[in-house]
Structure formats: C-alpha cells, structure tokens
Amino acid sequence: MCIRDRNLHRLKKGWDVKMDLKTYTTGIQHIGIPTNDIEKTIAFYQKLGFEIALQTVNEEADEKVAFLELETLVIETYENKAAKMESGAIDHVAINVKDIEEVYRYIEAEKMNTTKDTIHFLPFWDNGVRFFTIEGPNKEKVEFSQYL
C-alpha cells in the first residue's frame, strides 16, 4: 500500500495522519503581483526577458490576468485597480501541488487554515486550476495550486 493510500485509509478510520507535505508538492508554481496597469507590467517584465505564457480574464473578479515566464520562474500579474504600488507588492507565493484535496486535508488537520478558505476553481490553462490560500505567521499569503 503506497503512502497516499495508507493515509487515505487512516483518514477514513479517523486516525491521526502525519503526512509529509513534500509528497504532494513539486515547488513554487508562481508568484502573484497585483497591478493597476497590466500592460505596463507586462512590458516591464518582457524587457527583462519574460514571455507571456497565458493572458486571460478572471471573469469572477473582473480582472485581467497574465502569467509571465522566464525559464522556471512564473509571475502571475493581475489588474485589480487596488494595488498598493509600494515596496512589498508581492501578494502571494503559490506552491504547485499534485493533489489539492490531500493537501487541503493536511492543512485542515494541522489547523493551519486560519483564513477558513476553501478550494476554488479558475478556468486558467488547458483544464483549469484548483487552489486555496492560507496565511503565514507574518501575514504572508501562501497559495496551494493544482493544474488540472
């Protein structure tokens, strides 16, 4: 029985599950930077060598969104007209995960979901993404995100 199956079995039995979160993560997926002018932001990062990996609209939030890629670094920038435009402008760091449900259960079991966030879906990329966000001890946002 693999670790994942064993942990699912333990969860179903109501047992304490000490899961290694590293089993379900593959690294940083992207860094989120809000902007008041997405075209200016895209142009700036293109001058640094970034290429547009995806440009779309988050219709739910009425935001223009662009994912900009330079080698293995991906920046998600989104125009929300509420960016503070000051130092510390990074909004969140997203960790790429293989199984959003397992990670969510782990975060809940460890009582780390201080924001009480739930798993959301956005129709980005080919098949969409599912994600949720927690808050770290310094008020930083940590997003867990799975490409579908």
Language model: regions and residue ranges:
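Conserved small/polar residues in nucleotide/adenosyl-binding loops
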Residues: 1-5
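Vicinal oxygen chelate
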Residues: 10-15, 19-22, 26-37, 66-67, 84-148
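Core segments of cupin and vicinal oxygen chelate
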Residues: 25, 33-74
